[in-house]
């Protein structure tokens, strides 16, 4: 999991250097997200289905590339991240009291 996160952060940093653009949507190329405990939404390009994130799931990043929290959860910036109002911040989903 840590390796995946480090890889994802690398992708995010490279995306910052260039504008985020989506390829043409080809639903037949989308993978099945499998069982999604908190339901599904569309990916950052509004093409493929992805799972909403629950407690402890990664969220945020440019165009929410790391995920979107399910209803009742908020994306809280990871320790060490800068301005929490920056839409490119990576965080984890935390239940809203």
From Swiss-Prot:
Cystine residue pairs: 22-45, 25-47, 30-48, 36-51, 59-75, 69-93
GO biological-process terms attached to the record: innate immune response; regulation of cell growth; regulation of signal transduction
Protein's name according to its UniProt entry: Single insulin-like growth factor-binding domain protein-1
Parts of the chain that traverse the membrane: none
Keywords: Disulfide bond, Glycoprotein, Immunity, Innate immunity, Secreted, Signal
Additional note from the record: Does not reveal bactericidal activities against E.coli and S.aureus.
GO cellular component, one term: extracellular region
Tissues where this protein is expressed: Expressed in hemocytes.
InterPro entries: Growth_fac_rcpt_cys_sf (IPR009030), IGFBP-like (IPR000867), IGFBP_rP_mac25 (IPR011390)
Compartments reported by the entry: Secreted
Positions annotated with a glycan in the UniProt record: 21
Domain IGFBP N-terminal: 20-96
Major localization class: secreted
